[in-house]
């Protein structure tokens, strides 16, 4: 069994984002250094997906400031067998509203990819809010991305992107890795990109009822995936998940790495290490 760990390397940004922040948005990356130090030699390889998008350029004048702010750290991790990848949020500045909002097909995507790709080979992605669409996966495939691990099997949810509310839908995708169809991102098809779903945990009966109620309040009566629950690596796990997938994938964020998050994350890593045949891999090594 392959185990894939990813970190969405997000900064601290205000919401809504209407003007350039005065504070250092990347100060939260100090948490990553504390996590790495606490883990020591026991840290398995992780895929660090550094955020590069229009909101980052707006806030720092550069798409690649997340890499440059901790270049020595990222290079050190890469030298230890970790992988660097790309994370982004599909938002563009809406001049009419004077703030960032959701943009399903942003003009800046290729430029952000090129900027971060000047520092390392960009092979892996995770999307902001775990968002997926036919248009997005086709564009990632065209950019040469070989692994995306954003899918949440059975998940239907709603997120705020600036002042816009968007629906996240992975209700029909499989739990095992698949090459998406160019005209249906939730079904196997013709894209070269491999989608590796995040491993779901088992939801409680009460949790399933609450989730169905949430869906109904948002206009969806779908019962798909009610038994699935997403847990981050840094959250308490009551039990290990059970999945037929040959790849178990989990994620976390720098902001999750307070003392409690670091302790839980390392505890969960140790639990995964006890699984028979467990092999921790980076995203590219899934292939």
Language model features by range: what are they?
Residues 18-23, 57-61, 98-99, 120-122, ...:
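Surface-exposed cleft-lining segments at the edges of enzyme active sites
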Residues 1-75, 80, 121, 261, ...:
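Active-site beta->alpha N-cap acidic-glycine motif
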Residues 76, 117, 134-146, 267-274:
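Short, surface-exposed basic-aromatic patches at helix termini and helix-loop junctions that form
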Residues 127-244:
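Active-site-adjacent pocket scaffolds in enzyme catalytic domains
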Residues 42-133, 151, 200, 249-252, ...:
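Metal-dependent polysaccharide deacetylase catalytic core of the NodB/CE4 family, i.e.
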Residues 221-287:
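C-terminal domain-boundary segment and adjacent tail
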Residues 22-35, 63-71, 105-111, 174-178, ...:
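Well-ordered, non-membrane alpha-helical segments in soluble/globular domains
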Residues 12-15, 55-59, 92-96, 132-136, ...:
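Short catalytic/ligand-binding loop motif for oxyanion handling, primarily in non-cytosolic enzymes
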